[in-house]
Amino acid sequence: MAQVKRVRRDVSGIILLDKPRGFTSNAALQKVRWLLNAEKAGHTGSLDPLATGVLPLCFGEATKFSQYLLDADKAYETVMQLGVTTTTADAEGEVLERKPVAVTREQLEALLPQFRGDILQVPPMYSALKRDGQPLYKLARAGEVVEREPRSVNIARLELLALEGDKARLAVACSKGTYIRTLVEDLGQQLGCGAHVAELRRTQAGPFDLSQTVTLETLERLHGEGGAEALDALLQPVDSGLEHWPLLQLSEHSAYYWLHGQPVRAPEAPKYGMVRVQDNNGRFIGIGEVSEDGRIAPRRLIRSE
């Protein structure tokens, strides 16, 4: 008997998942996509399997704007295990070396200013970055080490929250592309004892924080009680990750031409930059960019219903 193909639902919005430990970001995405029975899905940047916390998952039309969340700043809390280095710079890797730890709070706090602001980081071998089409982590698993170019990142906040024995808890706010594993490893190297990430929790991704997230257990319970439709109430609006952008409302006439790819003028438009755009009924219809001549050029459009 032929298997009946599951018909996916055309749903749009963002679910803010508190990613559980042990899941890759893609595995978490596919699990939630299955629960939501969504046709189209994408996440906004990977969290390591060891990490937990804020993972925005985009569905339907929201996937058109996932890149802008990927580019957003992030915040984390991490537990740094002093005295132990590993192959992956976190607790998932094999131990490379153990050293005695005699680090004081004063020593660690004196070191932190060197890692604030604009710094250069060498990405870890165990990362999703690619070399000649191959992810670095696959090369690392094969025992290969390749040269990686340092990358500029920004650490807006780096604060010691607690130091208990050989474990330090840090709060970090940083730009996209920052590797907390590399930050912790570099700190350990400077302290002379080595270190790795024992725990990592993302507390913020762009405008979203932990208070807005939902657990996988909650999603599974709601699905069990009311099916995929029971999860729809948890979907954030498609443009919720862009609420810090200026919002412009077009007249019916202008919205028609804008949705057909034509730049238009709008009252109260900023002089430059990206903007969210609504039609005359207040419906979000896409994002645009202010051109040099002051007109709003469409960049990504929402499919009309």
Swiss-Prot record:
Keyword tRNA processing: yes
Enzyme nomenclature, EC number: 5.4.99.25
Keyword terms of this UniProt record: Isomerase, tRNA processing
Residue ranges of the TM segments: none
Record-linked Pfam families: TruB-C_2 (PF09157), TruB_C_2 (PF16198), TruB_N (PF01509)
Function: Responsible for synthesis of pseudouridine from uracil-55 in the psi GC loop of transfer RNAs.
Record-linked NCBIfam families: TruB
Protein name: tRNA pseudouridine synthase B
Gene: truB
